[in-house]
Amino acid sequence: MAAKEIIFSDVARSKLVEGVNILANAVKVTLGPKGRNVVLERSFGSPVVTKDGVSVAKEIELPDRVQNIGAQLVKEVASRTSDAAGDGTTTATVLAQAIVREGQKYVAAGLNPLDLKRGIDKAVVAAIDELKKISKPTTTSKEIAQVATISANGEESIGQRIAEAIDRVGKEGVITVEDGKSLDDELDVVEGLQFDRGYLSPYFINDQDKQVAVLDNPYVLLHDKKVSNIRDLLPVLEQVAKASRPLLIIAEDVEGEALATLVVNNIRGILKTVAVKAPGFGDRRKALLEDIAILTGGQVIAEETGLTLEKATLAELGQAKRIEVGKENTTVIDGAGEHKNIEARVKQIRAQIDEASSDYDREKLQERVAKLAGGVAVIKVGGATEIEVKEKKDRVDDALHATRAAVEEGIVPGGGVALIRVRNAISGLKGANADQDAGIKIVLRALEEPLRQIVTNAGEEASVVVAKVAEGSGNFGYNAQTGEYGDLVESGVLDPTKVTRTALQNAASVAALLLTTDATVYEAPKDPAPATSAAGPGAPGAGYDF
């Protein structure tokens, strides 16, 4: 085991605070509409230019081990905020730095760190309660666009694209972000349920231009086993042929004689069919088949339910208005399932999301909800260079997360104004003793810091602006984009309540832990190995410089 070094009290804290300040100073220059870029070196490939706080934080590793521990603690604030709300990482970092800076002064003056922490916690709880009171729900597409625009550092085109995507697929719909192939951003919307399985044979294609198989008003047969014997399928194929409608077969696999017969029937025009593999694996495959069954108003033909292929009737088959099957994807548009059954299924999956223990499971369940409840929108981010596309894509991701947070918990006035209003509302809060009062003062001072930093980045005098905004009420604030005072909600400067709340909670949590730290244990630096000459002491040329 490597040797460890230990430092205590003020020495330990001051080193940790130095690390906090180095990281926070690099991150906070990106805050606000006039925030600056940060260039990140890559060990391979082009450097990355970003205004995303968490991207900057993740890149920072300091050579001094103790300073690096402090930096890692603040990095944790940014990461936690990003994971929970998807945005607000720079605000969280600025708040954490302010709480640590103010708290360090009181600890150095001899106040009890634990009472300071209790005061900080009390002030944060009161601040969050007040934040919820001034929050209002997002109701219009315009508000959604405004939230997205602010999060994308003031780029209106990104805000409009995200608002349009939500309009098209609904608040529950899946919205993904991809690299585009042109200079402009594009929005591609897939209506209905899409899964990542394509046709099993190219002979099923009936639209040669698009290279897809299109089925209008088809039946849908869902089976959880492999189909290789055509005799199993014959009874249901005859019933579908009599109805003169096409058929989509979704099974674990369709192979051998069964697949060959379906292809021949398709080519001869006897019965238009397409066979695809069922999506997913194991238990997830069963769940996805059940989703498709509910969406199309059919049943999964499975031994568990007492149904067999030979005895299947049209009543067990699902139906849809249109199905498109490509090489890699199948899209079911306007399934014939009953709305109440789909809603019940969505509710059931949401309950599973609440109980899911892993992020992967939660993500896959949310994907299923979105596919049942809405559609899938793909925002393709355009740009002239790879660096530009990457930087813009980061901002679109941030804006998308901020928008989802706004839909979830509502919105508050942006530009740091919500925290100023909260500060004014809780300014009369008192703790159980003088040290707790000091903890409350730390938070009251920290709540000004995001506005101060936004104004500083805009090149204005922070103290003057903070004083003027504090004198106002409601949505009155400073718009750093235009340099004017006014109603920020009217001018579209909004923040999601969830982002502001999460940033404050995480910043206070980590900063308070740092203030109550009294010792730091770290690995002792290794002594560099002494340089040895290749030539021994008695060798020719030893001891001479050449």
From Swiss-Prot:
EC number(s) stated in the UniProt entry for this protein: 5.6.1.7
Known catalytic reactions: ATP + H2O + a folded polypeptide = ADP + phosphate + an unfolded polypeptide
GO cellular component terms listed in the entry, alphabetical order: cytoplasm
Top-rank lineage group of the source organism: Bacteria
Residues annotated for ATP binding in this entry: 30-33, 51, 87-91, 415, 495
Localization per Swiss-Prot or TrEMBL: Cytoplasm
Molecular function GO terms recorded: ATP binding; ATP-dependent protein folding chaperone; isomerase activity; unfolded protein binding
GO BP, sorted A to Z: protein refolding
InterPro entries with a match to the protein in the record: Chaperonin_Cpn60_CS, Cpn60/GroEL, Cpn60/GroEL/TCP-1, GroEL-like_apical_dom_sf, GROEL-like_equatorial_sf, TCP-1-like_intermed_sf
Keywords: ATP-binding, Chaperone, Cytoplasm, Isomerase, Nucleotide-binding
Family to which this protein belongs: Belongs to the chaperonin (HSP60) family.
HAMAP family in UniProt: CH60
Protein function: Together with its co-chaperonin GroES, plays an essential role in assisting protein folding. The GroEL-GroES system forms a nano-cage that allows encapsulation of the non-native substrate proteins and provides a physical environment optimized to promote and accelerate protein folding.
Assembly and oligomerization: Forms a cylinder of 14 subunits composed of two heptameric rings stacked back-to-back. Interacts with the co-chaperonin GroES.
Protein name, entry field: Chaperonin GroEL 5
Organism: Paraburkholderia xenovorans (strain LB400)
